[in-house]
A protein has these predicted regions:
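Short, solvent-exposed loop/turn segments at secondary-structure junctions
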Residues: 16-17, 43-45, 147-149, 188
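Short, well-ordered alpha-helices that flank and scaffold nucleotide-derived cofactor binding pockets
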Residues: 23, 27, 104, 200
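A conserved beta-strand/loop capping segment in the N-terminal third of enzymes
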Residues: 55-116, 122-124
Length: 203
């Protein structure tokens, strides 16, 4: 357990949201003298996700971008359109590179502490985070941890959205890897809303 359990800021969750927030705090001199704790259940090292985002400018993640596209297409069974994304680009990052890139930045920050622990409770009123490795206090607590209680008690209709992806290799260059396909609705809808992305990479 960490002996000094009081921090200026605690970040609960070391996924994309927590790491990007940590990076932003590190980049701002205002936080140089602030003690910051980031808590994540397990070390993030595997390539367990594919991250995609739009941007029209350089970002702190550009050096780990695996692929980017300037052209895109949209289609369904009766419609097809290709277009230039300018001034935007769509960028793709492998999560293992994302974790290591921002993880190194956090490790180099003297005012940051990274703790692998399971969060058991977040008390926002008293500003206490309880984990299986002790309790920690902070003036401000950030949390990106999913809480299904918010879903269960929401009175409005909710839609569940989930994605699954495959990596497909072809012997021939069967696709245009300069173009990304967004929302291909030509697939069987099966009384739902279904679409496909095609993120094409020439190896």
């Amino acid at each position: 357990m960490i002996s000094n359990n009081k921090y200026d800021y605690i970040i609960c969750g070391g996924g994309a949201t927590g790491l990007l927030l940590s990076s932003a705090l590190i980049s701002d001199n205002f936080f140089d003298d602030k003690k910051i704790l980031i808590i994540e259940k397990e070390a993030k090292v595997d390539n367990d996700k594919t991250l995609g985002f739009w941007d029209s400018k350089e970002t702190i993640l550009d050096e780990v971008v695996f692929k980017e596209w300037e052209y895109a297409e949209f289609k369904d069974s009766e419609f097809h359109n290709s277009f230039l994304l300018n001034p935007f680009k769509y960028k793709m990052i492998k999560s293992s590179k994302f974790y290591s890139h921002l993880g190194e930045k956090i490790s180099d920050a003297d005012n940051f502490t990274y703790l692998n622990a399971t969060i058991e409770n977040i008390d926002q009123e008293n500003k206490i985070v309880k984990t299986d490795n002790g309790e920690f206090q902070s003036s401000i607590i950030f949390s990106s941890i999913y809480d299904d209680k918010e879903i269960k008690f929401n009175k409005y209709p909710l839609l569940k959205q989930h994605f699954i992806g495959w990596t497909i290799e072809t012997k021939d260059q069967s696709f245009d890897d300069n173009k990304i396909t967004f929302m291909d609705f030509s697939v069987d809808q099966k009384n739902e809303i279904r679409f496909m992305y095609l993120s094409l990479i020439h190896i």
